[in-house]
Regions:
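Glycoside hydrolase catalytic-domain context in secreted enzymes
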Residues: 1-342, 362-370, 376, 391-398
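Aromatic- and Gly/Pro-enriched, solvent-exposed loop/edge beta-strand patches characteristic
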Residues: 378-382
Length: 406
C-alpha cells in the first residue's frame, strides 16, 4: 500500500511514482511495478513529450470529440513510454477565480467538466493507458490546501463537486483516482470512508484503485481529529489503496514509519482490509499496460572488489557480527566481510531540513562509488531506506561518505 517516488529506478525515468510489486517478495510472485507520470497537459518525464493545451482551454472548445481524439494520442504516448496511468485530468470545479490550479481544471460547470473528463479519460483508454481523475474532492484553492477544511452540504457536494468524477466513473473510462489534500467537513479526503467507499465504490460501482496525493495526511476514519501522513491505517480502512509516496526503495522497509504494522498488532487494522487494497491494486495491474511488459529485475547485484584485511583504514565493523556500520564524525568506516556473497544495503538516515530540501550522498568503497543515498529533508527524524544489492568478496571495504553539492 506504499508507492515510491519521485523518479523511481524501476520505471520510466523522470516519472512521478512506482507502485505494486516494489518488494523482493512481491516481485518473486511475478507482480510488476506500475508507473504513473504527472500531467495533465502532457506527459512529464526525463525525455521528450508532447505539450497539450490546458484543461480550461480544452473545455472552451465545447468539442468532446476533439478532446477525446487529442487524448487518444496522449494515451499512445503513455503506452509507448511504458507509463500506465497519467496523473490527470484534474476535474475539480472553478469555485474561485484565484485558485492557483484553475488552469488545469475544466470549468465552473459540473456537466461541462464531467463531459470533458469522460472525453479525456476515454481518449487515454483508447490509446492504451489510463487517466487518473483528481483531486477527489472539493479541492478548490491552493493556499493552505493541505489543511483548509471544505465545509459543504451534502446536496452541494453531490450536485456540484462530485458530478465530474461521477460521470467519468460511470462511463467506465477510469481505473485510477487520486484523493485531495484537504479535509471535508472535518475528515481528510485521503481517509474519507464516505468518499472512497460509500459513494465511489458502493453507489457508483467503481472497481479501480484510489491513491493519495503526494505526502498527503489522513485522520481517523470514524472520529476525525488530528491528521498525520503516517496514518495509513485509516487510509486503508477507508479503501484508499496506495499512499503516495515514500522514498525510493522505502516501501518494503517502511521508510515513512507509518502505522500499518503496529495497527495490525493492536487489532485496529485487519489483514482482510489490507488484502482488499492488494486485490484492488492487482486488479488494476492486470488491466494496465505493465502486465504486457517483460518482468525485468532492475535490482541486479553489482560486484565490488575488496582489499586485504591489513589495509583497513578506519574503525572496523564486521558484517556478520555487527550487521551494521556506524560512520564516525569524519564519515569514514571499514566494513569487514568474512564470507563472500550477495548483500542488501539498508540505511538509517536523518536530514535536519524540511521536506522541501533534498540531499545526495555517495558511499565510496575502496575509492569506487558503491551506492548513492538520496533523500528529502526529514526534519531531523530518522528514516530507513532500502538501497541496492551488492556482491562482496572476503576482505575489507574502506567506506567514505561524500556529499554531492548542487
Amino acid at each position: 500500500v506504499r508507492g515510491e517516488g519521485m523518479s523511481n529506478p524501476r520505471v520510466t525515468k523522470g516519472t512521478a511514482s512506482a507502485f505494486g510489486g516494489l518488494s523482493d517478495t512481491l516481485f518473486a510472485y511475478g507482480i510488476p511495478a506500475a508507473c504513473c507520470a504527472d500531467g495533465p497537459s502532457g506527459l512529464r518525464m526525463e525525455g521528450k513529450a508532447t505539450q497539450l493545451p490546458i484543461g480550461t482551454a480544452l473545455s472552451a472548445s465545447w468539442n468532446p470529440k476533439l478532446v477525446r481524439e487529442l487524448y487518444t494520442m496522449e494515451g499512445q504516448e503513455l503506452y509507448g513510454n511504458q507509463v500506465d496511468t497519467l496523473l490527470g485530468p484534474g476535474v475539480n470545479i472553478h469555485r474561485h477565480p484565484l485558485n492557483g490550479r484553475n488552469f488545469e481544471y475544466y470549468s465552473e460547470d459540473p456537466y461541462l467538466s464531467g463531459t470533458m473528463s469522460v472525453a479525456s479519460t476515454g481518449g487515454i483508454k483508447d490509446g492504451g493507458a489510463w487517466g487518473t481523475i483528481k483531486h477527489f474532492a472539493l479541492n478548490g484553492q491552493e493556499s493552505h490546501r493541505f489543511k483548509i477544511d471544505a465545509v459543504c452540504s451534502e446536496r452541494a457536494i453531490r450536485q456540484i463537486y462530485l458530478k465530474s468524477f461521477e460521470m467519468a466513473v460511470k462511463a467506465g473510462t477510469v481505473k485510477t483516482l487520486m484523493t485531495a489534500y484537504n479535509p471535508i467537513n472535518g475528515h481528510w479526503a485521503a481517509s474519507n470512508y464516505d468518499l472512497c467507499t460509500t459513494i465511489l465504490r458502493n453507489e457508483w460501482g467503481y472497481d479501480g484503485i484510489v491513491m493519495t496525493d503526494w505526502w498527503a495526511k489522513m485522520n481517523d476514519v470514524v472520529e476525525g481529529g488530528e491528521e498525520s501522513n503516517q496514518d495509513t491505517r485509516d487510509m486503508v480502512r477507508s479503501q484508499n489503496d496506495v499512499y503516495m509516496v515514500v522514498n525510493n526503495n522505502g516501501a518494503e522497509v517502511n521508510s515513512n514509519n507509518d502505522n500499518t504494522e503496529e495497527s495490525i498488532k493492536e487489532g485496529r487494522l485487519t489483514i482482510g482490509e489490507l488484502q482488499r487494497a492488494a486485490i484492488n491494486i492487482c486488479n488494476f495491474i492486470l488491466s494496465a499496460p505493465v502486465i504486457e511488459r517483460e518482468l525485468v529485475d532492475t535490482d541486479v547485484a553489482k560486484h565490488y572488489d575488496s582489499v586485504p584485511n591489513d589495509q583497513a583504514k578506519y574503525e572496523v565493523f564486521n558484517i556478520e557480527k555487527d550487521n551494521k556500520v556506524m560512520f564516525n564524525s569524519g564519515a569514514e568506516a571499514t566494513l569487514e566481510v568474512e564470507d563472500e556473497g550477495e548483500y542488501t544495503i539498508i540505511v538509517n538516515i536523518s536530514f535536519d531540513k524540511s521536506n522541501l530540501s533534498q540531499s545526495t550522498v555517495n558511499v565510496n568503497a575502496n575509492g569506487t562509488t558503491m551506492v548513492v543515498i538520496q533523500t528529502n529533508g526529514t526534519d531531523g527524524n530518522w528514516i530507513t531506506q532500502k538501497l541496492c544489492k551488492v556482491k562482496l568478496d572476503k576482505g575489507v571495504y574502506n567506506l567514505k561518505l561524500e556529499e554531492v553539492l548542487a
